[in-house]
Design a protein with these regions (language model features):
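Transmembrane alpha-helices and adjacent helix-loop boundaries
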Residues: 1-226
Length: 226
């Protein structure tokens, strides 16, 4: 074993592969952070749609969730990589394809978290808000969602961990994330054990840090309920 391959290529692996600060349009965090934010925002609308009284809103939101939770992420990535460019008549950059695929896919999971969070809020809260004269949309915005978000935080962090690890799948379309960066170095150095062990450690450190924070939040929220 020769771990000098790591130290000799640490700049490319970390700055390019993990942070996306190199010459390639890539980076694990550069993909994961926007995907988490945009996926959650879309998930809020989907989660609220799942609870809508109108079947014209509830049914499409339900079908969306059931469909994307029933197909593998890698298939969604391939759809955006091979099929969407054919429909548009032009090719798309790896980053756009990966980001769109992750946002669309993860929104289904974030939507279910939002739905469960909203349902965890006591019905009496909505009834009290209605009694004060608030409309349904105002009740959702000012009363239900703030309390629901508190209940969602641990689950949102857990799903974000899953998304962070899943970004390694973007390497199959040539997106230069941490996994792809290790593959590029390995093609030159032929040191798969050292390189992929390093990649695994980086993912583990990120996941462990986020999961530890999620457990801390769960304990804190349990001690200080809303």
């Amino acid at each position: 074993m020769d771990f000098a391959v790591i130290t000799n290529n640490i700049g490319f692996l970390i700055f390019q592969g993990f942070f996306g600060l190199g010459n390639f349009t890539g980076g694990t965090l550069r993909l994961a952070v926007p995907a988490i934010i945009l996926g959650f925002l879309l998930g809020v609308f989907i989660g609220i749609g799942r609870l809508a009284r109108s079947r014209w809103i509830h049914l499409p939101a339900t079908l969306y969730v059931e469909f994307f939770r029933g197909v593998p992420l890698v298939m969604v990535i391939f759809w955006f990589w091979f099929i969407i460019p054919v429909l548009l008549g032009k090719s798309l950059p790896e980053y756009s394809v990966a980001l769109a695929a992750f946002v669309i896919f993860e929104a289904a999971y974030f939507g279910e978290i939002v739905r469960a969070g909203i349902q965890s809020v006591s019905r009496g809260q909505a009834e009290a808000a209605t009694a004060t004269g608030l409309r349904r949309a105002q009740t959702m915005r000012y009363v239900i969602l703030p309390q629901a978000l508190r209940n969602m935080i641990p689950s949102l962090l857990t799903q974000s961990i899953v998304l962070l690890k899943d970004t390694s799948l973007a390497s199959i379309i040539g997106y230069v994330d941490l996994t792809k960066a290790a593959q590029i170095v390995n093609n030159r150095e032929i040191r798969p054990f050292e390189l992929y062990l390093f990649v695994a450690i980086i993912y583990w450190l990120c996941s462990y840090g986020m999961s530890t924070y999620a457990r801390h939040l769960e304990r804190r929220l349990a001690i200080n309920p809303a």
